[in-house]
Amino acid sequence: MRAISILSGGMDSAVATALMMDEYEIHAITFDYGQRSARMELEYARRLSEHLGIEHTTLDLQWLGRLGGSVLTAGGDIPSPSNLDDTVECLETARKVWVPGRNLVFTSIGVSFAEAMDAGAVIVGWDLEEAETFPDNSEEFLDAFNRLLEIGTLDGVRVVAPVIGMTKREIVEAGHEVGLPFELTYSCYAGDRVHCGVCESCMRRRRAFELAGIDDPTEYRE
């Protein structure tokens, strides 16, 4: 069976894709929506796809970034939470980096690709840790989306989220177990060649490797 993977270049979608390699013939898609990290995300998604031996397509969604509403696309200081376990603080961080309707748009486009290519599934990297502050990463969102697809697709395309019940630590452990080269993943909001080390995404990445006790191949500026 074929599947479409929404591959951002980050480790969550990378591990989700790697975990599904034995089950599906995968075609990865990556979006350029005007985010600061677009150049790096596209590069790493392409390199990882080459490593995995899967097809990869880049899609231009510049209009989504032009809507504004996020420091990832409209400029401004990228927030750096002082405590990743402080839900209130991380909720405020999430509001600043939230891109309006991003997962709705990405997943819907993935479904369109799946229907057009006779693929039965769309693979996403939604996870338990991010679901605490991003509701469009939650199991509730997944279940609701799949209920919608029962009506909105002809052949019953499903969204598959293999890491949705995992923390970042567990994602690193799962990726390590299947031999995923984490050096071919990129997580930083800032978009520089070297990870900044202080945005929330970098902080969660670094902590995940530390908690897992697995060597982190990432170079951080701070």
UniProtKB/Swiss-Prot annotation:
GO terms for molecular function: ATP binding; ligase activity, forming carbon-nitrogen bonds; zinc ion binding. PANTHER family: 7-CYANO-7-DEAZAGUANINE SYNTHASE. NCBIfam families: 7-cyano-7-deazaguanine synthase QueC. InterPro entries: QueC, Rossmann-like_a/b/a_fold. Disulfide bonds: none annotated. This is 7-cyano-7-deazaguanine synthase. Pfam families: QueC. The gene is queC. ATP binds at L7, S8, G9, G10, M11, D12, S13, A14, V15, A16, T17. The keyword Ligase applies.
